[in-house]
Amino acid sequence: MVFQPNSGFVHVARRGVTLVELLVVIVIITVLMAMLLPAVNVARESGRQAACQNNLRQFGVGFSSHVARRGTYCTGAFDWRRDGCVTEVGWVADLVQSGTPVGKMLCPSNPARIALTFNDLLSMAWDVDTCVPDRRGSPPQTMPDGSRRINPCRFLAEGDPSSSTPPPTGEDRRLFVEKEILLKHFNTNYTASWYLVRSGVVLDGSGNLVARQPGCSASLLARGSTLGPLNAARLDSSSAPASNVPLLGCGAAGGMLEANLGDNDSNSPAVMPFTRGPVQTATLEAPPPFSAGTPMATWWAVWNATLQDYRGFAPVHRNTCNLLFADGSVRAIADQNGDGLLNNGFPSNLGGFRDATVEMPPDDVFSKWSLRPN
């Protein structure tokens, strides 16, 4: 500061910030951001995992209400091909009809945002098939004003014969599925367990899987070869505690969506409807056919050595997967080796398993072929 007679005191101009100082500040900010961002991401994922667990708990409350009213935990899988009309049959329809908007309650961490059954709804040709429940669902209803109400699946299958309206095709079909099914909350990115929607196998005296209806093919995925949705009596008499029997979990992608639907682009991942049931540990397939007259001791030992194929569940929460159990509890199961799968006892290098690390031990997650006591 200096004094000038005619102008008084004046300030000397301050030195500006040098380039080096500016770079130091930028480096400090960058380091701080690098330190904070992982913590922010962890906090964000913790929130997503909590939201997912809350979804599953609410679904569990719905299952408990359903079993109290109707004896079964649900009416089946969210699967038009195997279980019938998705707006009337299946655990998603059960919950939506009771006021739970399942399609709005998606696992927020799962990159798959839609169920694989939408590919069938978009393109599968309907035909009479007595081996599965009627995919058309309930018959049309005449309303008090004389109008007809036709459920979406029936309209997809046959249109409205009373007005000579054909079923929608192409873009009209896509828009119809989007408006009448997807946007009305009939959707999920959770996968049901085989126990929830099939619960047990139907075997003949030689230990072979059979179809209860003549002329139909036997399959672990078919309702006709299984005991159907889990009921209270079957669970109560089980050899496993309800806290170990999984019902629902974060879903793994089982394919890609065929067309744009809502916020989901074509070729987006889509989750499978339910896990595949009991398979042999050496092949990941159901036991092969037994010869007629095979002793029970022989075929029972083969079935008893199988394990549930839980590859339909995915560890989408930073290597953990949320599972809902039959007692209403929700637990996070960790993918310990980072292979993207949850191993419940399968050997390494089979079906995508990186090694034989058991991430779902039998004391935590039940995996037997039958809920019945041995």
Task: Please place each PLM-identified region on the residue numbering.
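C-terminal accessory segments of extracellular proteins
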Residues: 279-374
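Acidic, glycine-rich loop-and-strand cores that form catalytic or ligand-binding grooves
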Residues: 172-306
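N-terminal leader/signal peptides at the extreme start of proteins
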Residues: 1-17
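N-terminal single-pass transmembrane signal-anchor helix
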Residues: 14-48
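Conserved hydrophobic/amphipathic alpha-helical signal-anchor segments
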Residues: 34, 39-89, 101
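Short catalytic/ligand-binding loop motif for oxyanion handling, primarily in non-cytosolic enzymes
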Residues: 67-68, 74-76, 82, 113-118, ...
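Non-catalytic, alpha-helical, charged scaffold/linker segments
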Residues: 110-227
